[in-house]
A protein has these predicted regions:
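Repeated scaffold domains used in trafficking and secretory/extracellular systems
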Residues: 47-54, 87-96, 165, 182-192, ...
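Residue-level detector of Asp-centered blade-edge/turn motifs that repeat once per structural unit
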Residues: 55-58, 95-99, 193-200, 274-276, ...
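Blade-loop segments of beta-propeller domains
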Residues: 76-126
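Residue-level signature of beta-propeller blades and closely related beta-rich strand-turn architectures
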Residues: 68, 107-110, 139, 168, ...
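Surface-exposed loop and turn segments in beta-propeller and other repeat-based domains
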Residues: 37-42, 139-186, 229-264, 308-342
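Beta-strand-rich domains and repeat architectures in extracellular enzymes and scaffolds
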Residues: 38-68, 187, 193-194
Length: 389
């Protein structure tokens, strides 16, 4: 007969093993930014150029927007899955750690850029114009060529204010013009605190695209919208590109302006960095000679908006104006501060502890690619970022 003590010991071991196996798996810990790969090569794709990046350091995935396609890859650059079939312009991306999803800007319009995308996609005729925040359920992206419309991986929320500004005709100081504030749509997208605060709830923040018309004065501000997305599930719906819905909030929770001088197509990439408590705006070079035409600007999160009239904009009253950060190079003629930094307009992502991933776009055999490099913020006037090697 088996010794009773041995039986008791075996039973205790079985209970311990069952209890251990029944425990939920521990969540993966985010990788310290300094230990992340110094370089991630996205590979090349037969699409438009890379528009933005988003990083999930906990689950160790990186996401790229290639104009009409979303790419999910691991941190070595190996592609896990793609979402295709878009005939609009998929711009910047941001990862929301609160719900584990990737948010992006999506534009449908019949201007030169929109027509080019439609032609490249084989779409005949025009399309209903509209602007959407698209939300990707990235856990479901498990293979390449998943359909944005049919595979249940993407929902969309309509942003009515941007469409209204895009389609508006206004009376400027130079006469009647289309596109209020020069609005060409929107590109930059990120989560951060309400302007004027460094903590609290995170608001989805969108930045306008702005046409680079040098003959008007109402397009010299960056325009930023903030939304509280905690109740956005009621608006989310799949997007049929043949019959696009109009589900979305009536207005943003805040509209803000930053005077930078005109930049071609506004803010290309927008990100908020918790370590420095700043918003960063990466832009294309502007064409107006009276401005310094920096390619990187910053706004301190603690800077409170001030109700002010907008210079060169006669058709609105006093608006919420945010000052630029007092870091960077100051242009003595205008007081505008910023940096001449050559990268960031195709991807700028804060990942913690003053580290950033920044896209270096390239073309190879007529295909578009990006080498995404790890940088550390220095704050210096001449070299705001240093590459980590």
């Amino acid at each position: 007969m088996m010794n009773r003590n041995l039986l008791r010991a075996a039973a205790a071991m079985a209970v311990t093993l069952f209890t251990f196996l029944a425990q939920p798996a521990a969540a993966a810990e985010p990788v310290p930014p300094a230990q992340l790969p110094r370089l991630i090569d996205s590979g090349t794709f037969p699409t438009g150029h890379i528009q933005g990046i988003a990083v999930d350091t906990e689950h160790r995935y990186i996401y790229y927007s290639y104009t009409t396609m979303l790419v999910k890859a691991d941190m070595q650059g190996r592609v896990v899955g793609t979402v295709t079939g878009l005939v609009g312009h998929l711009g910047s991306l941001t990862f929301n750690a609160e719900d584990g999803r990737v948010y992006g800007s999506l534009e449908y319009k019949n201007d030169a850029i929109g027509r080019g995308i439609l032609a490249a996609s084989g779409h005949e005729g025009e399309i209903n114009e509209g602007f959407y925040v698209v939300i990707f359920d990235v856990d479901r992206i498990t293979r390449t060529d998943m359909s944005a419309e049919r595979d249940g991986v993407m929902t969309a929320v309509f942003i009515g204010d941007i469409l209204r500004d895009y389609t508006a005709t206004v009376r400027t100081e130079q006469g009647e013009r289309q596109h209020r504030f020069g609005c060409s749509g929107f590109d930059g997208i990120t989560f951060g605190p309400r302007f004027g605060r460094t903590g609290g709830h995170r608001y989805l923040t969108l930045s306008y695209g702005i046409y680079d018309d040098t003959t008007r004065t109402d397009n010299d501000y960056q325009v930023l919208l903030q939304y509280d997305t905690r109740r956005w599930r009621r608006y989310e719906a799949p997007l049929s590109q043949s019959a696009m819905h109009r589900n979305g909030p009536e207005h943003p929770d805040g509209r803000y302006f930053v005077f930078t001088g005109n930049t071609a197509y506004g803010v290309q990439n927008l990100c908020y960095d918790d370590a420095t408590k700043r918003w960063y705006m990466a832009v294309y070079y502007g064409q107006k000679p009276q401005y310094p035409n920096y390619t990187l600007f910053a706004v301190d999160a603690a800077s409170r908006p001030v109700k002010s009239a907008l210079r060169g904009v006669p058709y609105v009253g006093r608006e919420n104006v945010l000052p630029l950060s007092d870091t960077g190079v100051e242009d003595k003629a205008t007081g505008i501060r910023g940096w001449h930094f050559p990268y960031g307009s195709t991807g700028l992502c804060a990942i913690g502890d003053v580290y950033f991933y920044i896209s270096h776009h390239y073309v190879e055999n007529k295909r578009q690619g990006s080498r995404i490099r790890l940088y550390r913020w220095t704050g210096s006037a001449e070299h705001p970022f240093e590459q980590v090697r």
